[in-house]
C-alpha cells in the first residue's frame, strides 16, 4: 500500500491541524513514510481521512459517528484508505493517537518518555474500532498533567480531561466546566475586598493549609424554607448568584459552574448555623444554599431564552454525610428542601484505605454508606478519589491490584467525572507513574487488564531493570498480605501503617534494596548506550528510594539502641 496523504477539511481548525501533524510525525518515525497534509481528495495513492473531509461523504461520516458519545471516536478502512472520525474536535486528536498507539505500536509512558517501534508498516484495521470514554471527564492527577508542571501534548496523548489545567485550542480548547480558583472557592464568589467592610457578618476567617482565608455564611439570604429572601437587598446567596452570572457572560459556552467549600474541616459557624445543622446536617445546609443559587440563575436564564446550566459542589470533609434519615428501614431525605436540584452535581471527595479498592467489603464502611445515602437526595455525581499518601509519597502504596475494580466500580455507580488523585505536584514518584499509565488507559476503554498495562509500562520504562522492579513490588505485596493474614492492620493512606516498621520488616526492606541492585547490574551489562544506561539507572534509583526511605524513617524501631 502506497500511503501518500492525510486529508483534512479545507477550513480545518487548530485541533484538526494538530492531530494531523501528530499523525504525520509518528507515521514517519515508525514507518519512514512522509505523508503530505492536504485538503483535497488525492487522485492517486492511499490516504488517511481525518474528520469531515472531501474524501468521505456526509452520509458515510454520519454513520461512522452515529453511535459515539462525547469525545468518542471511530477508525475504519475502505478501499485501502483509513478513515478517522469523531464527534468533537478533541475526539479527532484522540482518534489520531488511538491509531498511533493501536496500529503503529507507539506507547506514551510519561511526559518525558515514549516508546516508538521502528520499521513497521502502516496497518489497515481489519475491523472498525469505536471507542467512547468511560467517563465524560477523567484524570489520574500527577504533575505531568497538572497546571505549571503539565505538558500540553501529554495531556492530549493520555486523553486527560479535568478541571485543573486548561488546554489551548490546538489541544482541545476550553472545557465547558469552570469555577474560580477551580475548587475551594466560596470566598472567590463573595470577594472580601468588595463586601468585607460593609458586610463583615458575611465572613469568618479560617485556617486552610497554613493560610488564613475568609469563608462565607451560606445561610445568609435564605428563608427558613430554603428560598431566597427577596426582602434582603444584599445577601451571600444573591451575591454568589450574580457573580456566577458574570462568569456565564464571560464564558457563554459553560455548562457547569463549580462552587465548593474551602478546603479542610473549618466553616462559618454561628448560632443560626448550629441550629440549622442540628436539623439538616452541614450537608443539608450546603444543598439548600446551592439549590437556591442554581435555581435563581436558571430562572433568569430561562426568562432570557437561554439553556440551563449546572452547579457542582463537594460532599467533602464536614459535608460528606448525606442529609438523610432512616424511616421504617428506608433511607429518605430529611425533608424536601435538601433534595438536590436536577441541575446540582455532587462531587464526592473521599479518602480511603488504598490497600483495598473503593468498593471492597474490607474498605472503610463510611464510603459505601456515603455513596448509598447520597443517592436518596441527588442524581448526578462526580468522584474525587485518592491514590496517594500526602505524608510520604515514596512509601510503598500497595494499590496496584485495585485499579480495575475502582474504574469499573465508578462506571457502575454512574460517575461522570472520575478524578484519581496522585502526587499532583511532582512527576517523579515511580509507583504513581505506573498506576497512572494503567488508569488512563482504562478510562478510555482499553481492552487489556490493569495487570497487563502495568507490566507493559514496567517492561518498556525500566528495560533490563524491569524484572527487578517487579521483584520489589512482589516483595512488598507479599509482606503486606502476610501481615494482613497475621491480623495486622494494613493501611495505605496518610500516616498509614504502610509507612511503619510493623508491616515493613527490616529484612524485607533490605531484600527489596538487593532486588534493585541486581537490576542495576543487569542494566550495566545490557549493552545499552551510555545515555540509556544512565537513564535506566536513574529510574531504578527512584525505585530504590522507597525501601531506603523506610529503613531511614524506621531506624529506631529496628534499632532502639541506635542512639547509643
Give the residues covered by each predicted segment.
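Substrate-binding cleft/loops of secretory-pathway carbohydrate-active enzymes
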Residues: 312-350, 394-399, 428-435
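Structural preference for beta-strand elements that scaffold enzyme active sites
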Residues: 139, 254-258, 308-312, 343-347, ...
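Aromatic-lined carbohydrate-recognition surfaces of secreted/lumenal glycan-active proteins
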Residues: 290-325, 381-388, 418-421
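Catalytic domains of carbohydrate-active enzymes that cleave complex glycans
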Residues: 441-564
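Structured mid-domain segments that build the active-site/substrate or prosthetic-cofactor binding neighborhood
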Residues: 235-238, 245-249, 365-467, 471
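Acidic, His- and aromatic-enriched active-site or binding-groove loops in soluble protein domains
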Residues: 277-293, 331-356, 438-448
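Feature activates predominantly on carbohydrate-active enzymes
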Residues: 11-22, 26, 65-294, 298, ...
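Short, well-ordered secondary-structure micro-motifs within conserved domains or adaptor modules
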Residues: 36-65
Amino acid at each position: 500500500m502506497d500511503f501518500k496523504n492525510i486529508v483534512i477539511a479545507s477550513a480545518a481548525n487548530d485541533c484538526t491541524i494538530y492531530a494531523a501533524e501528530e499523525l504525520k510525525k509518528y507515521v514517519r518515525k515508525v514507518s519512514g513514510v512522509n505523508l503530505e497534509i492536504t485538503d483535497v481528495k488525492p487522485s492517486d495513492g492511499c490516504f488517511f481521512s481525518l474528520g469531515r473531509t472531501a474524501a468521505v461523504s456526509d452520509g458515510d461520516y454520519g454513520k461512522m459517528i452515529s453511535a459515539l458519545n462525547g469525545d468518542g471516536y471511530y477508525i475504519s478502512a475502505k478501499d485501502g484508505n483509513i478513515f478517522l472520525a469523531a464527534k468533537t474536535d478533541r475526539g479527532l486528536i484522540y482518534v489520531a493517537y488511538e491509531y498511533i498507539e493501536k496500529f503503529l505500536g507507539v506507547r506514551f509512558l510519561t511526559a518525558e518518555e515514549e516508546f516508538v517501534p521502528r520499521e513497521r508498516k502502516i496497518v489497515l484495521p481489519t475491523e472498525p474500532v469505536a471507542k467512547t470514554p468511560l467517563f465524560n471527564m477523567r484524570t489520574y492527577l500527577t504533575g505531568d498533567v497538572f497546571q505549571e508542571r503539565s505538558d500540553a501534548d501529554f495531556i492530549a496523548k493520555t486523553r486527560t480531561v479535568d478541571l485543573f489545567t486548561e488546554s489551548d485550542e490546538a489541544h482541545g480548547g476550553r472545557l465547558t466546566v469552570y469555577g474560580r480558583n477551580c475548587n475551594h472557592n466560596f470566598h472567590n464568589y463573595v470577594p472580601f475586598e468588595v463586601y468585607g467592610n460593609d458586610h463583615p457578618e458575611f465572613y469568618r476567617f479560617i485556617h486552610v493549609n497554613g493560610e488564613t482565608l475568609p469563608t462565607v455564611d451560606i445561610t445568609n439570604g435564605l428563608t427558613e424554607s430554603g428560598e431566597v429572601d427577596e426582602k434582603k437587598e444584599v445577601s451571600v446567596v444573591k451575591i454568589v448568584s450574580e457573580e456566577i452570572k458574570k462568569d456565564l457572560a464571560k464564558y457563554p459556552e459553560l455548562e457547569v459552574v463549580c462552587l465548593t467549600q474551602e478546603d479542610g474541616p473549618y466553616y462559618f459557624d454561628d448560632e443560626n448555623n448550629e441550629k440549622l445543622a442540628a436539623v439538616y446536617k452541614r450537608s443539608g445546609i450546603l444543598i439548600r444554599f446551592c439549590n437556591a443559587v442554581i435555581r435563581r440563575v436558571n430562572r433568569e436564564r430561562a426568562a432570557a431564552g437561554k439553556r440551563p446550566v449546572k452547579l457542582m459542589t463537594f460532599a467533602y470533609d464536614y459535608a460528606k454525610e448525606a442529609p438523610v434519615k432512616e424511616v421504617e428501614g428506608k433511607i429518605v431525605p430529611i425533608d424536601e428542601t435538601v433534595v438536590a436540584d436536577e441541575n446540582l452535581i455532587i462531587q464526592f471527595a473521599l479518602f480511603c484505605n488504598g490497600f483495598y479498592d473503593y468498593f471492597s467489603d474490607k474498605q472503610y464502611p463510611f464510603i459505601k454508606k456515603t455513596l448509598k445515602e447520597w443517592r436518596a437526595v441527588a442524581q448526578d455525581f462526580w468522584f474525587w478519589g485518592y491514590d496517594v499518601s500526602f505524608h510520604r509519597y515514596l512509601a510503598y502504596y500497595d494499590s496496584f491490584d485495585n485499579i480495575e475494580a475502582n474504574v469499573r466500580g465508578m462506571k457502575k455507580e454512574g460517575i461522570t467525572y472520575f478524578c484519581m488523585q496522585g502526587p499532583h505536584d511532582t512527576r517523579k514518584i515511580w509507583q504513581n507513574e505506573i498506576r497512572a499509565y494503567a488508569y488512563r488507559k482504562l478510562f478510555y476503554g482499553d481492552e487489556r487488564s490493569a495487570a497487563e498495562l502495568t507490566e507493559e509500562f514496567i517492561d518498556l520504562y525500566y528495560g533490563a531493570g524491569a524484572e527487578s522492579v517487579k521483584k520489589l513490588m512482589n516483595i512488598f505485596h507479599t509482606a503486606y498480605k502476610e501481615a494482613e493474614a497475621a491480623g495486622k492492620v494494613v493501611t495505605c493512606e496518610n500516616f498509614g501503617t504502610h509507612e511503619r516498621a510493623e508491616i515493613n520488616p527490616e529484612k524485607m526492606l533490605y531484600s527489596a534494596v538487593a532486588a534493585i541492585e541486581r537490576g542495576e547490574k543487569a542494566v550495566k551489562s545490557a549493552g545499552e548506550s551510555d545515555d540509556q544506561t544512565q537513564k535506566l539507572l536513574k529510574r531504578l534509583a527512584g525505585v530504590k528510594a522507597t525501601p531506603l526511605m523506610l529503613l531511614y524513617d524506621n531506624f529506631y524501631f529496628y534499632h532502639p539502641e541506635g542512639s547509643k
